[in-house]
Amino acid sequence: MNNGTKLYMLVEEKPIGIVSVTKGLIEDLYILPDMQNMGHGTKLLLYAVGQCTDTPTLWILENNINAERLYRRIGFKETGRKNAITNKLDEIEFALT
């Protein structure tokens, strides 16, 4: 996985989700809106974690409460690192420790 991998989730042969994994960095986790709140995001995230070769980390926008809830439920914790996206919005790093 040194160059990164995109993982797709299919339901009845239709793509409903995607996530990218590069070493330990998990990015772009997305589940179609009409397929959310059914456990698909959790399953895809857990699979992505299993593909990581380094400590699983990810970044979320500070106002993305739903994503934060999912990541915390799996065991991710804030690392204390932040990136300013705009002067009013930060991106926060989480890691699975």
Question: Where are the regions a protein language model picked out?
Answer:
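A short helix-loop-beta-strand connector motif used in the catalytic cores of GNAT acetyltransferases and
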Residues: 1-8, 25
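Conserved GNAT acetyl-CoA-binding A-motif
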Residues: 51-63
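Conserved acetyl-CoA pyrophosphate-binding loop and the N-cap/start of the following alpha-helix
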Residues: 34-35, 39-47
